[in-house]
């Protein structure tokens, strides 16, 4: 139904009609554009949107906003302008409003850089990060307390989604990044971020999103039910995290 695309001018009217007909009271957005749209329009929607603030959704949706917001922290990657003569190759190019590594390219020189800019609009240029990549699943309660940080691998990627992922140890470096993000954005409920090591083996921030990720199910097997926690949290019901301490590997076709 074309009326139920957020690009449709009548979307909110038809969406509210659907919510009323099916007596839906809570919405879990699982796509960045939809989460951003619903957060901005929560006042017009006849159900509770389980996501973070408008600020957190906007900053996390656009890479330029994300990197500008965290530019004073050492985990923010180097960002170049296309006109800069100081670019250190190789560099990584990606859409400002992209996700999951889609339409991402490595450029080894100015010719390749200009080629990609001639074919794709709205690209940003960052330093190339050659090291290990992780997703980090988090949960922040309605009081702003970061209650859970769960790093996991991205071993097999399809469509920008981790189809094989293993829980790994939480280090002080990852904990610092998570707490810094949480202290700088108005986050509420489940959220996640992705990091990758640079040439000096330090993690740099790739992206973040104030929603549930596709592979948060890794930690569901450790007792962390992000969906249920977020449901209680959306109603200002205090929750506690009880994690089973054993490694988990998730693999799917």
Identify the function of each model-found stretch.
Residues 188-200:
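A short glycine-rich, hydrophobically flanked beta-strand micro-motif that places a catalytic Asp/Glu
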Residues 228-253:
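Peripheral (often C-terminal) accessory segments that flank ATP-dependent C-N-forming ligase machineries
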């Amino acid at each position: 139904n074309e009326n139920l695309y957020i690009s449709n001018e009548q979307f909110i009217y038809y969406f509210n009609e659907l919510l009323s007909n099916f007596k839906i009271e809570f919405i879990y957005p699982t796509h960045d554009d939809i989460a951003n749209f619903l957060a901005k329009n929560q006042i017009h929607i006849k159900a509770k949107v389980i996501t973070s603030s408008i600020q957190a959704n906007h900053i996390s949706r656009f890479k330029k906003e994300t990197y500008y917001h965290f530019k004073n922290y050492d985990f923010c990657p180097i960002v170049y302008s296309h006109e800069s003569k100081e670019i250190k190759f190789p560099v990584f190019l990606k859409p400002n409003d992209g996700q999951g590594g889609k339409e991402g390219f490595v450029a080894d020189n100015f010719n390749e850089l200009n080629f990609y800019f001639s074919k794709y609009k709205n690209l940003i240029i960052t330093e190339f990060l050659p090291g290990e990549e992780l997703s980090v699943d988090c949960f922040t309660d309605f009081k702003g307390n970061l209650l859970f940080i769960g790093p996991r691998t991205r071993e097999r990627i399809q469509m920008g989604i981790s189809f094989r992922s293993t829980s790994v140890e939480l280090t002080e470096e990852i904990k610092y990044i998570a707490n810094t993000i949480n202290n700088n954005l108005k986050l509420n409920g489940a959220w996640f971020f992705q990091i990758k090591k640079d040439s000096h083996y330090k993690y740099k921030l790739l992206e973040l999103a104030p929603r549930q990720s596709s592979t948060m199910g890794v930690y569901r097997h450790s007792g962390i039910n992000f969906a249920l926690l977020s449901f209680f949290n959306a109603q200002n019901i205090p929750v506690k995290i009880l994690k089973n301490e054993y490694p988990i590997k998730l693999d799917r076709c």
